[in-house]
């Protein structure tokens, strides 16, 4: 399952495939390799209310995104070290997927650092759709209403909402941005299952998303 619902879809027109780039609803125009994952397994504007930055001891990848992408994580520290670590690594995993899209690399090392198994396979396919269509992402993303729980066995779950109302698809060849109207589908819920690996990193093993989720509506 992908990190967020596909912003990119393909429709057939006769024998020719016509690309329809959308971001959760209808909109107007403005002038994601088939390789298998091993084990299959700043310009960026940062958050106004972000959790602590990732711990450097695990040598987490440096994620630098272009200035046309911004993120707001409306989830504050919980006061619990494990829960805060889950939130922090989840922030980076979200940005890492967009970095792979920006880099046009479905096997980008940064996101593979945070995803494994089923989640990695689904995310690779999601990124490859953008790569195949020479498309990227632009705009502003907001994440809110986190619900995190940590088990003693080194596993955790995180549910949260995403506001995609100001996030768009961008064609790389023409630099055209597909601007879309904000609809109920612009609000997406996510449910992730994570595991703490040997490096102390909370990696995502499963992820389920629902666009238009009632619990995420403003």
What are the functions of these language-model segments?
Residues 30-31, 43, 72, 143, ...:
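Intrinsically disordered, low-complexity, compositionally biased regions/tails
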Residues 40-70:
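Acidic, low-complexity proline/glycine-rich segments
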Residues 61-136:
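Core segments of small alpha/beta cavity-forming domains
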């Amino acid at each position: 399952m992908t990190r967020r619902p596909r912003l990119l879809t393909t429709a057939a027109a006769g024998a020719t495939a016509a690309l329809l780039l959308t971001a959760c609803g209808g909109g107007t125009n403005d002038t994601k390799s088939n390789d298998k994952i091993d084990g299959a397994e700043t310009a960026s504007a940062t958050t106004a209310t972000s959790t602590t930055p990732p711990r450097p001891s695990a040598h987490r990848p440096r994620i630098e995104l272009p200035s046309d992408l911004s993120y707001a994580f409306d989830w504050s520290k919980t006061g619990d070290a494990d829960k805060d670590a889950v939130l922090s690594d989840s922030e980076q995993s979200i940005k890492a997927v967009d970095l792979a899209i920006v880099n046009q690399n479905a096997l980008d090392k940064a996101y593979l650092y945070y995803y494994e198994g089923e989640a990695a396979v689904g995310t690779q396919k999601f990124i490859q759709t953008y790569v195949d269509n020479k498309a990227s992402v632009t705009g502003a993303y907001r994440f809110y209403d986190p619900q995190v729980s940590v088990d003693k066995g080194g596993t955790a779950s995180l549910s949260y909402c995403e506001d995609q109302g100001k996030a768009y698809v961008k064609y790389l060849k023409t630099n055209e941005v597909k601007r879309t109207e904000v609809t109920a589908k612009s609000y997406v819920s996510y449910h992730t299952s994570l595991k703490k690996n040997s490096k102390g990193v909370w990696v995502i093993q499963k992820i389920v998303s629902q666009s238009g989720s009632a619990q995420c509506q403003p």
